[in-house]
Amino acid sequence: MSTELDFEKPIRDLKGKIEELRTFTEEKEIDLSDEIEKLEKRLHALEENIYGNLKPWQRVQIARHGERPTTLDYIEQLFSDFLEMHGDRLYGDDEAIVAGIAKYKGQPVTVIGHQRGKDTKENIRRNFGMPHPEGYRKALRLMKQAEKFHRPVICFIDTKGAYPGKAAEERGQSEAIARNLLEMAGLKVPIVCIVIGEGGSGGALALGVGDRIHMLENSTYSVISPEGAAALLWKDASQAQRAAETMKITAPDLKELQIIDDIIPEVRGGAHRNVAEQAEAIDQVLEKSLKQLSSLTTEELLNKRYEKYKKIGEFSHVNDAISVN
């Protein structure tokens, strides 16, 4: 059973009441089907109300859920013949990034993604999904290989950010991220990026320069965490909920700002409720994106990518005079 979040307590309590009635019915052999049916209708309405009106901070909580599907979960669901590749050929291998070749509906593709752990031991091994420079350089090595063999690149984004430790800085963290941005902008094959959890700062962006950028409904994409923003703006990390509402980090906000292309609907309650069903929703958008991009010539692909990023952040001057009393 999935771990419930704080705001889901009313749902949890009502489910508990329904389960109690079912147990009572079985033990006492009393027909309470009408009462159970009424409670189930109330439960459905409650879920619709809560999950249909999620606040930014609640989406952050879902994006961070410990049982949320990872890159490897989606690779297992969406691709066949996945062969993971290791190492950047410069320093070492970084398990915070998974990269390899696979087949998607019979088509050879390159798949790259952040990978966090499912428990403490795996999180330590994968550095909690926060890559070192060798992780980004491994990703770039696979991207250049994909370009050589004309394979589309599919990136799954799910990280709190690039690892900010001393060793990472010594090995050129900022250069590795910047190099990926530069190379992805000119990569001569289709790139589809999907934010499946947290999209944290440059650590996410280093896998996020694509021809299509999609987000799961309850994922986030931001330049800094809400806690970090709150600490900077108000000197109080406990103001994270307020920061999340101000920062415009959710999929609906970023769709409105034209940062992303599509919002992928999530299973009610979050992707962790049903991985297979969530993968089907991703599959529909991914197939459509690859079909559209594969029909373009290399020149058309690069020109459209250039125009896509050129218009992000455009603004208009307001010429109306402002009077100050």
Curated annotation (Swiss-Prot):
Keywords: ATP-binding, Cytoplasm, Fatty acid biosynthesis, Fatty acid metabolism, Lipid biosynthesis, Lipid metabolism, Nucleotide-binding, Transferase
Single biological process term from Gene Ontology: malonyl-CoA biosynthetic process
Listed GO CC annotations: acetyl-CoA carboxylase complex
SUPFAM superfamilies per record: ClpP/crotonase
EC identifiers of the protein: 2.1.3.15
Keyword ATP-binding belongs to the record: yes
Pathway: Lipid metabolism; malonyl-CoA biosynthesis; malonyl-CoA from acetyl-CoA: step 1/1
InterPro entries, per the entry: Acetyl_CoA_COase_a_su, ClpP/crotonase-like_dom_sf, COA_CT_C
Location relative to the cell: Cytoplasm
Domain CoA carboxyltransferase C-terminal span(s) in chain numbering: 38-292
Any GO MF annotation of the entry: ATP binding
Catalyses which reaction(s): N(6)-carboxybiotinyl-L-lysyl-[protein] + acetyl-CoA = N(6)-biotinyl-L-lysyl-[protein] + malonyl-CoA
NCBIfam families referenced in this protein's UniProt entry, alphabetically: accA, AccA_sub, PRK05724.1
UniProt similarity note: Belongs to the AccA family.
Role according to the record: Component of the acetyl coenzyme A carboxylase (ACC) complex. First, biotin carboxylase catalyzes the carboxylation of biotin on its carrier protein (BCCP) and then the CO(2) group is transferred by the carboxyltransferase to acetyl-CoA to form malonyl-CoA.
Subunit structure, as described in the record: Acetyl-CoA carboxylase is a heterohexamer composed of biotin carboxyl carrier protein (AccB), biotin carboxylase (AccC) and two subunits each of ACCase subunit alpha (AccA) and ACCase subunit beta (AccD).
Designated name of the protein: Acetyl-coenzyme A carboxylase carboxyl transferase subunit alpha
Organism: Halalkalibacterium halodurans (strain ATCC BAA-125 / DSM 18197 / FERM 7344 / JCM 9153 / C-125)
Lineage: Bacteria, Bacillati, Bacillota, Bacilli, Bacillales
Gene: accA
